[in-house]
């Protein structure tokens, strides 16, 4: 529907506060760093992120949660196997996956809130919603509450990052066939697991 809006109508809803030198669409490691650096160099900068939390795939469903779970799993393995060989005997070791996931989520929240703090510190305006290009200088941000915000930018950087993609003929249901995102939110440890892909 935004593409049927006239230029005159669009400009009517733009205030001086929504005029920027640079708007970055995407709040991942590329996007938020770009917005912060632009602000540090004296530009009036904004960032649009649809996920609801800054940090992109890396902080939310990639590197950070992976490292958190790998670290906790390694500690469990050491307590089970390595400690006993070194003379440290521990009985009744159990894995509480619910607590592990809670720990992982707390780590994510600390880091994403840290990026929000950097935005405030460097005076980067943060728009939570989906950014849609109306023209080479005009953006509409659709928020989850159906609110619409119009933004004007002299320059626009698109840093939308990655998303989960299915393989041909393979339906990801997040139950039997899970994406990398789903694999970070298991409620129990699978007895058997085949992994397609060797990335982090």
Give the residues covered by each predicted segment:
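Aromatic/hydrophobic pocket-lining residues that form π-stacking "cages" and hydrophobic walls in ligand
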Residues: 34
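Glycine-rich flavin
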Residues: 17-20, 37-43, 49-189
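Short, Lys/Arg-enriched N-terminal segments with co-localized hydrophobic residues
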Residues: 2-15
């Amino acid at each position: 529907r935004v593409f049927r809006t006239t230029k005159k109508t669009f400009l009517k809803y733009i205030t001086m506060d929504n005029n920027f030198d640079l708007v970055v669409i995407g709040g991942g490691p590329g996007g938020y760093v770009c917005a912060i650096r632009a602000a540090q160099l004296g530009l009036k900068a904004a960032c649009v992120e649809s996920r609801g939390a800054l940090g992109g795939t890396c902080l939310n469903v990639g590197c950070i949660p992976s490292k958190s779970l790998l670290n906790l799993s390694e500690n469990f393995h050491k307590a089970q196997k390595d400690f006993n060989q070194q003379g440290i005997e521990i009985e009744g070791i159990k894995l509480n996956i619910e607590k592990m996931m809670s720990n992982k989520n707390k780590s994510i929240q600390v880091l994403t809130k840290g990026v929000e703090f950097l935005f405030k510190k460097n005076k980067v305006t943060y728009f939570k919603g989906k950014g849609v290009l109306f023209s080479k200088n005009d953006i509409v941000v659709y928020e989850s509450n159906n609110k619409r915000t119009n933004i004007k930018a002299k320059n626009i950087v698109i840093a939308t990052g990655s998303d989960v993609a299915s393989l041909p003929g393979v339906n990801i249901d997040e139950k039997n066939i899970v994406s990398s995102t789903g694999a970070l939110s298991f409620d129990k440890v699978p007895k058997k697991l085949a992994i397609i892909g060797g990335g982090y």
